[in-house]
Each structure stands twice: as C-alpha cells, then as structure tokens.
Design a protein with these regions (language model features):
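The structured alpha-helical core of multi-pass membrane proteins
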Residues: 2-656
Length: 656
C-alpha cells in the first residue's frame, strides 16, 4: 500500500551525513535553540541580587540541566525507547498499552495535554521576545501588533504546507547556532572567569543559600523545554543524527549562555533593564541579530505547530481524540494540516499575546506544563525499561533520579502559578478533560456493543443473496465491523442485512480495522467466509496512519481480482457483457446515545460531554475516508440500561 495520503512514501533523512545533520538542526532544535532569547532575562527578573556567585550558580544550573535533562535523559535514554523509529510520549505509550496496568493511559493523556498546551504558549513567548529586540533600536516601536502580524502569517501559511521553505530551515538554523556561539565566545573573552560555571559546586551553593532558589530554578528550566520536542522528532531524523547534531547545538547554546553571563557581570547596574541576549550583540550587527532571532522564532513556532498536528493525528488513532479532517498540503510523508486545530491554536496564541503583552509576563506561564510532560515521560520510560528486562536497580535509579529532578522543577514552576502558570494549567486541564472523556466514552460504547458468532449466519446471508424476490441493494455491500473478537459480528450489522430491510447483494464485505502499536504499519488480510459471497478483510493500521478505507479497500479488491480470488464483474447481463464491475455501497451503523438509557448520573454527564466534544470532529464516513456519495448511515440507539420495566395491563377489552 501507499501512505495515508495516497502518495508514494518519501524517505526521511535518517542516514547520518551532512545533509541528515543539517535537516536535523532545522527540524529538531528550533524550540531549545531559541531559549537563549529569554532564559537569562528570566533569571535576572527573579529578584535575586546580581553578583558573581549568583550568575555563576545560575549558569552552572543551566549547564547541568542541559546535561542531566536533555543529554542523559533524552538523548542517551529516551531516543533508544523508539517505536519502530518513532518517538514522543504517545509513541512510547503505544508500546506499553498492552501492559496490565489499565491506568497507564492516564499518564499518556496528561503528558500529551500538557505538551499541546506548551505548543500554544511557546510561539507567543518566542516571537514576542525576538521582536522586543527592536526596542533597543526604537523604544516606541509597537511590539504587540508586529508580533500578532507575524503569528498571523505563520498560521495562515500552514494550509499551503512548508515543503519549499522547510528545506532552508537547516541552513538558517546552522547560521543561527553559529551566531550564538561566536557572539558568546567574544563576550566570554571580556570575563574569562565565567568558565568556572562548569563546576556544579556553584549551582549547589546558589540553591542552598538563595532564598529565591525556586524562582531561579523556574527560570533555569526554560533552557530545556525543547527537550520533549527533540524526542518527538525522532522519527523525522533518526537517533544518530539527533545525538551528533546535539553535541554541536549544546556547545553553541552553552557558549551563548556563558557570554550573556559575562556581559551581566560587566554591567551589573544596567543588567536588569535590558535583555542580555541582545546586549552582547555588537551594535553594527544588532539589526541582523534581531532578524535572525525572529527567523529562529518562526522556525521554532513552525516545528511546534507541525508537532501539534502529528500528536493529535496519533491521538485520533489511539482513540484519545475525535476524528478531524486532515489535509496533506504536500507530498512529504507525515506533513499534516488540521484546519480546526490550526484555527484553535491561532486563537490561543493571539489571546496569550494580548493577555500578557510582553515576554517577561509570559515567562510565568511558560515551563509549568512541559515540566509535567517530562515527568509523565519519565514514568512511562520506567515502564518501558522494566518491560525490556532492564536491571531493576537501574530502572529504580532512573525513575527516582528524574522524578526527583523534575519534581523539584515542578515545585519551582508552581511558584509562578498565580503570575501566569494558571494559563498553562487551564489549557492543559481543558485538553486533559476532553481526552479523558473521549477515552472513557469510547470504552462505554464498546462495552455495550452486542456481538454474535458470524458463522451462525452464513446460511441466511447466502439465502438472501439467492432470493430474487428481494430487490438488489448493491453489487458489493460493505460494512465496518466494530466487534472486537475474531469470528464475531456486531448484531446491529446483522439486523441491517437481515431484519431492517433485507439487503441482497452479490458480495458482502466486512471490514475490521485494527489500530496497531507500530507507527507506519499498513497491511491487510482477507478471508473468504462464504465462497463468492462473504468476505472478511482485516486492515492493520499504524497509529500514525490516517485511515482511508475506500482507498485501501480498492487496493485490496484489485489484489484479489488480479490473483483471481474473486470475480467482481457485474451480474447484470448488459454490464457483464462489457466487463463492467459491480458497484460498491458502504453501510455505517451509527449508535446514538440517549441520556435516558442510563440511570447512572455520572455516566450521563460523561456521555453528554462526549456528545459535545464529538461536534468538533467529523462524522464516521469522513473519518474513515469513505466516498460519502456511496455511504448510507443507519442510526440505532446505544442502549446502556437494559433493566427496562415491563408495562402493566390495567384493563381488559371484552369482545361483545
């Protein structure tokens, strides 16, 4: 089969080489690569007195956070926890969902919802900070309108795809990181003692003695917020490319942070009033640096928007999120565009910009959500290591170490809750509620689907086919079978064929869709249940693949016809004479929930919220990629309360 968009698969740049490394730098490190724009500024705004011990301690915290959190946890450990080459919290969950722990999905949806919330906040703070650099040239420049204009353009171009400009991201980000490193080295030469920050002693002393340690750590954490995105992009670039390019990126980042620290210690009196990132830039290249910063912010925003589309596409196949219309603006595999989500993200980013106005206030909203994502990833990695037979001691040490580190960062970021962290938690909470309700409601719907053994109905289906007194409904009649167990069939499907309106056809097709734990699987198996009459097709679809049943069934039928396992030529003499194939018609059984069908108030509330959430999605025929002109939807009630009272006779009719 071809990919989900119907196009041939386009290979990703997973091979190690200059091109692969260049593409990796452009795709993976946009978020973490723009952190120098605001991290040092956020540290200075904690209120801690500026002196050598404070700056050395803060820089030491940055260096060792990048080392422990990004390098060891994500590059060395998490990148090895891949799902057939794919990474990210949902890909990791897909590896683990067969485990006996029924609540493990809670960790996944908490992590996914907080990661999505971060994807709304990051473009706002990154672009705003870059544009604020213009204030050093023209203090009265309207930052907010310019930021909103850039954000509008970024979201508007999503519908056209970014294939053409995306190829230049790698070159641009390479120049960006070189700029960070070179300017950092120049600034370091003015205060070489800043290199003492590599000693973790200064970090320990600062955190032990400073009364503002939690505020400082909250600011320091911003340097590693892009680490989760690094893991999510594993499938695009490959582990080796990410690991090798990270060595270069980390070096450039640390050099720039050290350069900013050197400038602060040389300008203690004025450090509070300016952004050290722009302050270390020579005046003759300041405009160029601002342009580069804006471009890097756009690249970072683009990566997060694309990442959001990918996460929600995975969530749909994992039954965490309602099916939505997905477009493929280019022929590049994996490049998606979800119009509803693009609009929702745009509105969210605009509201955050208008609510907080400047990047200093946005810093309070930033970091809290992604800390929770990282904590959930740590717990899932612990399950993964245990499932792979890793030494128990190592697994316990890993979970204990990183739960402690991230727990401390979480505590530090919670101190910013009232100042803006509530915004991230509000967005995360709404997304979590939607995912949780969707998962629970889908389980309820599956729980109350009644099934019957399919082989009990072979004869009657054959009899209906042969009964010419029944008008022919279609040459080929296709049903999507929602029964979980092999060899069983949804009883409402049988009711549709036999009872509701007997449907005579030449061939009956039952489509079983199995969403598998691997990302890009697209396979099928076909079983002939009744020769020349009844067929069962099972489609195995990876969690990154968009289901398009019409397209896939056409390929299945072509395979069967070519191998002479089925003859689909129309049975009408005039059409058969000319070799015209018979028509296809799809029947979708749609269960409608009625609140009065359950006496459980909690269940009623959950299903009512589910009904509201489902309105943002698309109906089942579109969700399955069916040609709606060939589809008939039959609505049946979803009966949850089977204990229906009997009617009591109150009078007898006497016949005279």
């Amino acid at each position: 089969m071809k990919d989900s968009s119907g196009h041939p698969v386009v290979c990703n740049h997973n091979k190690v080489g200059f091109l692969g490394l260049l593409v990796t730098i452009g795709i993976v490190f946009g978020d973490i690569g723009t952190s120098p724009l605001y991290v040092m500024k956020a540290i200075l705004h904690t209120g801690e007195a500026i002196d050598e011990s404070t700056i050395l301690g803060a820089l030491s915290c940055i260096i060792w956070t990048l080392t422990l959190q990004t390098t060891i946890k994500y590059v060395c450990v998490a990148l090895r926890a891949d799902n057939n080459g794919e990474g990210g919290i949902l890909a990791l969950y897909a590896l683990l969902r067969r485990l006996k722990s029924k609540w493990i999905y809670i960790l996944a949806i908490i992590g996914a919802s907080t990661l999505l919330a971060d994807g709304i906040i990051t473009p706002a703070i990154t672009v705003t900070t870059a544009i604020e650099g213009l204030e050093s040239i023209s203090p009265n420049l309207p930052v907010t309108p310019i930021t909103l204009a850039i954000i509008t353009i970024i979201f508007f171009v999503q519908r056209f795809g970014t294939e053409s400009i995306g190829k230049s991201f790698g070159v641009f980000m390479l120049l960006w990181f070189l700029l960070l490193g070179i300017i950092g080295v120049i600034s370091i030469t003015t205060f070489p003692m800043i290199l003492k920050a590599f000693n973790p002693y200064y970090a320990v002393i600062l955190l032990a003695k400073s009364p503002q340690w939690f505020l400082i750590l909250g600011a320091v954490f911003l340097c590693t917020t892009g680490a989760e995105a690094l893991y999510s992009d594993l499938g695009h670039c490959g582990r080796k490319n990410i690991a090798i390019s990270w060595a270069f990126v980390k070096t450039m980042l640390i050099l720039n942070y050290l350069g900013q620290g050197a400038w602060v210690l040389n300008h203690v009196q004025t450090a509070y009033s300016v952004n050290p990132f722009f302050a270390i830039m020579p005046q003759n290249i300041l405009v160029f640096a601002i342009i580069m910063a804006t471009g890097a912010a756009i690249v970072a925003s683009q990566a997060l928007i694309s990442g959001t589309f990918s996460i929600l596409s995975e969530a749909m196949n994992l039954h965490f999120w309602p099916r939505m219309r997905i477009k493929h603006p280019t022929h590049v595999k994996g490049q998606l565009y979800i119009p509803v989500i693009n609009l929702a993200m745009y509105i969210g980013v605009v509201l955050i910009i208008l609510l907080f106005r400047d990047s200093s206030r946005m810093e309070a909203a930033y970091g809290l959500a992604i800390t929770i994502t990282m904590l959930m990833t740590t717990l899932l990695l612990g399950f993964y290591l245990h499932s792979k037979g890793m030494a128990r001691l190592f697994t316990i040490l890993f979970i204990g170490t990183y739960c402690t580190i991230e727990g401390i960062f979480l505590t530090a970021n919670l101190s910013k809750f009232l100042a803006g962290g509530w915004c991230a938690m509000l967005i995360s909470g709404i997304l979590f509620l939607m995912m949780y309700v969707w998962v629970r409601a889908m389980k309820i719907r599956r729980q109350y689907i009644s099934t019957k053994p399919l082989d009990d109905y072979y004869q009657i289906i054959s009899d209906i086919k042969a009964d010419e007194d029944i008008p022919k409904y279609a040459s080929n009649l296709v049903y999507v079978n929602h029964a979980d167990k092999q060899g069983t069939v949804d009883d409402k499907l049988l009711y549709s064929i036999i009872n509701k309106q007997p449907k005579r056809a030449d061939h009956y097709w039952l489509i079983n869709m199995e969403f598998v734990d691997t990302p890009d699987t697209l396979e099928y198996s076909c079983e002939t249940l009744v020769p020349d009459t009844l067929y069962s097709v099972t489609m195995h679809i990876g969690f990154r693949i968009e289901p398009r049943v019409s397209l896939y069934l056409r390929q299945v039928v072509e395979d069967l016809v070519d191998s002479k396992k089925v003859d689909l030529t129309s049975t009408y003499p005039s059409l058969r004479k000319n070799g015209i194939p018979g028509d296809f018609r799809f029947i979708i059984i749609h269960r409608v929930y009625y609140p009065e069908s359950s006496v459980n108030r909690q269940q009623n509330l959950l299903m009512t919220i589910y009904a509201l959430i489902s309105k943002i999605g698309i109906d089942e025929p579109k969700a399955l990629g069916l040609d709606t002109s060939m589809v008939v939807v039959e609505r049946v009630p979803l009966i949850i309360n089977h204990h229906i009272g009997s009617i009591r006779r109150i009078a007898q009719i006497v016949e005279e």
